[in-house]
Amino acid sequence: MSRSDFATDAVFRKEAEEVLEHLLQQLDEIDYDEFEPRYTSGSLSLQFDNGTVVMLSMQTPTHELWLSANYTAWHFLCTNGQWIERDTSESMLTILSAIISEKVLQQVHLV
C-alpha cells in the first residue's frame, strides 16, 4: 500500500485534524455516560468508566492515523479518501465503531 493520499505533511495534518474533529463531534452527539471523548492537537482519546482508554493519533512521518485499544494497534492510511488499515484493509470507522460498541454494549455506527 502506498504512503497515503497526501503530498505534504501540512496537507496530511490538516486532513487528519479534520477527521479527528469530525469523530469528536459524532462521539459528543452519542452522549453515552460510559466514556468521555477528548481531543488534543493530533490525538483523540476515549476514556471509559472502567479505566480503559482508546487512542487515535496522527503520525505525520508516515501519514497514518494509529489506533490503540485492547492491547492492539491498527495503522490507517488514507486511500482514495478512505482511512483503511494498512495490513487488513478494514475501514477505520468500522473498526472504531466495533470497539466502542463492545465497550458500551450498544451498537455505535460512526460515519
Stretches with model-predicted labels:
Residues S2-V111:
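N-terminal intrinsically disordered, cationic/polar leader segments
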